[in-house]
A protein has these predicted regions:
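N-terminal alpha-helical "arm" segments
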Residues: 1-41, 329-341
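Short alpha-helical segments and helix-capping/turn motifs at coil-helix boundaries
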Residues: 25, 182-185, 305
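Hydrophobic alpha-helical segments and helix pairs
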Residues: 3-20, 147-177
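Sequence/fold signature of self-assembling virion shell proteins
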Residues: 215-341
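Assembly/oligomerization interface modules of large self-assembling protein complexes
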Residues: 30-98
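Short, Φ-rich (hydrophobic/aromatic) sequence segments
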Residues: 13-14, 182-187, 327
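Long, contiguous amphipathic alpha-helices that act as assembly "spine/axial" helices in icosahedral shell
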Residues: 80-157, 180-183, 187-204, 315-322
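Acidic/histidine-enriched, beta-strand-rich ligand/metal-binding domains
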Residues: 170-198, 203-211, 215-219, 225-230, ...
């Protein structure tokens, strides 16, 4: 008889964290893989005049004098890699029933697939971080293996990055009498287009909702804005749709990434982002720089997964996924980022 029930075995799952690529799915829907190491912005439809401001980073400092505007760019290259250690196939996997042990061949397949999932997750976190930073700041620092850090600046207007201070701080307002609607409408005027969605982090949402006027105006009913609801529904455990505030959807994002074994939130505390679900975010990718990929005629691709064995005494087996991601906004001023206080 088994030592564990089915429920106990199902519970023996890998540790979860709240990773949910909301910004990628909501704002970055176009994908452009290139057959060249560089990404050419002029080859993306509608971006003929777009250029990035590129600045090397030396010892943590952005060197503006060495930067410049460019319409072609070399993305950072990422390639998370794992070894499939033969010793791992001899040990019981965490979810194996001790009374019904699997054979090493099965464990090897399981380990390979788990490695691939971990590698895909590692790359997806890089992409989401680029997407979030592009929306929040209009720029981000790009890093990769054997790649000097570079700041990618999309040219966000300074007026679109707002920090509340002094008399504008919501935390100092009377929660029973003050109405933050006028503030939001004023912030929205800085956007280059119409604002139809606001994304909060949990603390920012708590501050916003603390106003009596907000609780009275927030419409939590469904059905009146079908297009918006379609865009924001079923977005996962790390995303919560709170309702409509006038003609604007309110969403709370608690997505996380892991850095050096520590879980961190993608959105800083007390963040509010105003945007539009039709904003044109671009997932661009440089070519895969791998001889095996070239032999398989796989050059323009967002991913290149591989599993191989090196001969020797002993032979060793590895898994790896390669990618050269560069998340861009066609118009960084479609978003307004507000640091609440």
């Amino acid at each position: 008889m088994s030592m564990y029930t089915t429920a106990q075995l199902l519970a023996a799952n890998e540790q979860k964290f709240k990773f949910d690529p909301l910004f990628l799915r909501l704002f970055f829907r176009e994908s452009y893989p290139f057959t060249t190491e560089k990404v050419y912005l002029s080859q993306i439809p509608g971006l003929v005049n777009m250029a990035l401001y590129v600045s090397p980073i030396v010892s943590g400092e952005v060197i503006r004098s060495r930067g410049g505007s460019t319409s072609e760019f070399t993305p950072g290259y990422v390639k998370p890699k794992h070894e499939v250690n033969p010793q791992m196939t001899l040990r019981r996997l965490p979810d194996e029933d001790p009374q019904n042990l699997a054979d090493p061949a099965y464990r090897r397949r399981r380990i390979i697939m788990q490695n691939m999932r971990d590698e895909e997750l590692a790359i997806a976190q890089v992409e989401e971080m680029q997407a979030v930073s592009a929306v929040l700041k209009g720029k981000y620092t790009m890093t990769g293996e054997a790649f000097d850090p570079v700041e990618v600046d999309m040219g966000r207007s300074a007026a679109n990055n707002i920090t509340q201070s002094g008399s504008t701080e919501w935390s100092k307002r009377d929660k029973s009498t003050y109405d933050p609607t006028d503030d939001i409408e004023a912030y929205a005027l800085n956007a280059s287009g119409v604002v139809n969605i606001i994304v909060f982090d949990p603390k920012g949402w708590a501050l916003f909702r603390s106003f009596k006027a907000v609780r009275e105006k927030l419409d939590t009913r469904r059905g009146s804005h079908s297009e918006l609801e379609t865009a924001v529904k079923d977005l996962g455990k790390a995303v919560s749709y709170k309702g409509m505030y006038g003609d604007v959807a309110i969403v709370v994002y608690s997505g996380q990434y892991v850095e050096n074994g520590v879980k961190k939130n993608f959105l800083p505390d007390n963040t509010m982002v105003l945007g539009n679900t039709q904003a044109r975010g671009l997932r661009t990718y440089g070519c895969i720089q791998d001889a095996d990929a070239q032999r398989e005629s796989i050059n323009a691709s967002a991913r290149y997964p591989k599993n191989w064995v090196t001969t020797g005494d002993p032979a060793r087996e590895f898994t790896m996924i390669q990618s050269a991601p560069l998340m861009l906004l066609a118009d960084p001023d479609e978003f307004v980022s507000v640091q609440l206080a």
